[in-house]
Curated annotation (Swiss-Prot):
Taxonomic path: Eukaryota, Metazoa, Chordata, Craniata, Vertebrata
Family: Belongs to the GST superfamily. Alpha family.
Gene designation: GSTA4
Modified residues (N-acetylmethionine): 1
Reaction it catalyzes: RX + glutathione = an S-substituted glutathione + a halide anion + H(+)
Protein name from the UniProt record: Glutathione S-transferase A4
Organism, as annotated: Bos taurus
Length: 222
């Protein structure tokens, strides 16, 4: 039996959550080793397990992969979530890169000063509604298909759904002006592997709380 991938990261969303999403969508079971102390990170660094001294790190297929996008590409390619040809791969990559720019605002939000957090929610909403969501609404309206690229599930769909659902936690009506994205979100959420990941008891992490923020500061701050 093949060894399960092992994810090394604190017990929270951060940059590892996209990796969890893609593995889950692919139907791949995985283990996690949560970082809780600076000493655990130091041990990984001293053991030459982290190419650039940073996490996320995923042990998979005899490798220790780092750099979030590289990890996502490897898993997506392995599990046929990265298009059928170069053109599709490039489209998927463009969509993913754009969505990850938006997702990064969500990842960093809990580490802002309290006075700045509400302002940043407004900023995220504005960017989503003006810059990002119109792109995907136009794509879905234009080709009339269920998925963004190639009429099959891809990394682009997974990362977009992750980002939409995370935004809806803060701004429930964020999709009110985007009917195609509303329908798309429901359809992708009901793909069996994704539906299972969205159910209680899965390895999907909850929104970051004060405990997660303190843990991250304790591990990574000098």
């Amino acid at each position: 039996m093949a060894t399960k991938p092992k994810l090394h990261y604190p017990n929270g969303r951060g940059r590892m959550e996209s990796v969890r999403w893609v593995l889950a969508a692919a139907g791949v079971e995985f283990d996690e080793e949560f970082l809780e102390t600076k000493e655990q990170l130091q041990k990984l660094q001293d053991g030459n397990h982290l190419l650039f001294q940073q996490v996320p790190m995923v042990e998979i297929d005899g490798m220790k992969l780092v750099q979030t996008r590289s990890i996502l590409h490897y898993i997506a390619d392995k599990h046929h979530l990265f298009g059928k040809d170069l053109k599709e791969r490039t489209l998927i990559d463009m969509y993913v890169e754009g969505t990850l720019d938006l997702l990064e605002l969500l990842i960093m939000h809990p580490f802002l000063k309290p006075d700045d957090q509400q302002k940043e929610v407004a900023n995220m909403a504005q960017k989503a509604i003006i810059r990002y969501f119109p792109v995907f609404e136009k794509v879905l309206r234009g080709h009339g298909q269920r998925f963004l690229v190639g009429n099959q599930l891809s990394l682009a769909d997974i990362i977009l759904l992750q980002t939409i659902l995370a935004l809806e936690e803060k701004i429930p009506n964020i999709l009110s002006a985007f009917p195609h994205l509303q329908e798309y979100t429901v359809k992708i959420s009901n793909i069996p592997t994704i539906k299972k990941f969205l159910e209680p008891g899965s390895k999907k992490k909850p929104p970051p709380d004060d405990i997660y923020v303190r843990t991250v500061y304790n591990i990574f701050m000098p």
